[in-house]
């Protein structure tokens, strides 16, 4: 729930026996001195809080008792990608032999998403046949950086696309270069498309990837580390493909809607018996 939705639920249930369960999917700062937080996530009337990641629970533990929180990662069903598999999209101008890295993120006004760092990483790979496909909103300054830099021919800035996920099938790597993030949906989508993942070592995103098995985890805020990670996977395409297959099995078995509903029902049952 958003802060506004949670506040509305608290006001609407005032004076009723209804129990309010909150959801926290971000590591955004919480200020105890700011009274508006007590209209939402810090309100003592909240019976329980569902946290998207363990790191979020640890952050909230400064304000909320751990026994009032449950970690429940967002689910993803591979069947949601059936139409994507049936109608994949490609990018014109990229050689069929190229190693294709894709990034799905809206970075306009959000420098923490790491697009500029990723562009700098590609500039360290101009001696390769590695191409970056970027889909999402971006700042003009980042576009100019990409188009005026030494890797311009290897960077394809496609902008926002409602059908962005249709570009995932057949790509070699999906990358999340963020300096902070929660638990990116794009990584789940990539895993459901059997695409290996490279993520920065930040809370939330790193939980999705098993380092060395479904992808690799690299140092954050480091174009050099990102470039080296891409180079390593490009040098062993067979292993990269195996990582994509392993990621598919992980998302298919560990992030099911059935398991998510089971955890949620367990929380509801426990609250109602108190």
Can you say where each PLM-predicted feature lies in the sequence?
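A conserved, positively charged/aromatic
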Residues: 14, 20-47, 63
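A conserved mid-protein helix/loop that constitutes part of the nucleotide-sugar donor-binding site
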Residues: 99, 109-124, 188, 224
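Short His-centered aromatic/hydrophobic patch
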Residues: 1-6, 24
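Aromatic "clamp/platform" in nucleotide-sugar-dependent glycosyltransferases that forms part
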Residues: 160, 179
